[in-house]
Amino acid sequence: TNLLFSVELVVEPYLQNATPNSMHVLWETDLNSQSVVEWGLYVFLSESTTGSSFSNYGSSRIHTVELTNLEPNTQYYYRIVVGNYESYSDLYSFITPPEPSSEADFRIVAMSDMQRDSSNPNKFNEIIHDGVIDYVSEQYSDNLSEALAMVLVPGDLVVTGSSYYQWQDHFFEPGSDLFAQVPLYPVFGNHEANS
């Protein structure tokens, strides 16, 4: 019997290592599959870039695709291909940073010690959605990538860094609406224990 396995998205796309001319898009699937991002200046996504993946936990794979030759301070739209074009992520956007010589102002979000607290297990989700996203949308713009340049989380992202499911359920899932549009810069603390 031939069984078909459908690739599932385990961690929604998130952005890292933004430069004026490039952006890294990462995500995780439960099985091995290709690493493809469709992207463009407009929602019809005229470009496609292939990256690579590596083993994470069990059969899961972390995918990384570097989008290059981008223009500084420019909005791009993207989505990831899940499996072999079986499905797609939602459509997201990001804005590349301006050239450093422009000395443009920018806003960041910095928060630390976001690990789950058993007495208040939904606090990180509340901070992301009720705090950051709602506040930024009301004060600056509904377009998060236009309003924020980066998210900095210096330490203690999860309680136990060696626990695979804490990363998935306690960090990436609550932050996914923000991390898919604004580059994430985590710094490991003592709770991550060199994970």
Give the role of each language-model region.
Residues 1-6:
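Sec-dependent, cleavable N-terminal signal peptides
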Residues 7-188, 192-195:
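Divalent metal-dependent phosphoesterase catalytic cores across multiple superfamilies
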